[in-house]
């Protein structure tokens, strides 16, 4: 053998010896890296949290879904499950009870749903939290909807936009109708009327300002007036079109709002007005809030009034769909107040 080959063999044996010594001595193991601050931060200050810090930051709660589903040892602390400690059958969940946001990012198949979302849904049910789940594939409704309803007594509502005919109802006017019904039964109940007006204003603003933008420049008047006019129409519909013996079904929904605005665009032959909205408002008492909300549109010119009503119709066009109406025209299984 030449001297070069012998030298290379010796170098290789030396490297193997160093690697073996490092491996068996444990010097290169991550387990031997201590959470010890080095220097004055010139090499960085990040480090792993100690067990004491973890216990101080998070609540360690035994994760026992088998017992929870029997109604036993239900957790009292509400929060997000961010991790776990322990071994099989003795797992303690790390629960953050602060008012925080959590973003889970991972590649396909890493367990975002099975190992993160499902444990959080189980814990939310056990601790009594209301939650909204965006379920584009339908897995959550199939896998955990029945669990939440059967074992924890939850009221589950599924809004299925893929198959609206099998979806639960979601009437946008549910709360407005409810509080307006209370007002009719108790005319002096100002709190109920105030809530009906509040929810009508919220709904109108959401429909008119769909992108959440409130600055329309020179057209700002038309959008503000459209918002007030839509609020007025919603309140009128909720107050004067309740179910009766002739029409026992609920007719107060967003499609009826569109139809009423469309009908009010027609000229009033009796009052000889270019639209029927002004004569309708004249029949209301001067102190009626619907008349106040529509004040900006009522005091404008006929051309501006037509533009305002056209703006309302254009915003309501998004709700005109035969399938979508199967969801929007039926009372909600739950409302925002029940959810909260």
Where are these regions (language model features)?
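Basic- and hydrophobic-enriched, low-structure N-terminal and domain-boundary segments
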Residues: 1-110, 114-122, 127, 165
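P-loop NTPase motor domains
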Residues: 74, 78-89, 93-340
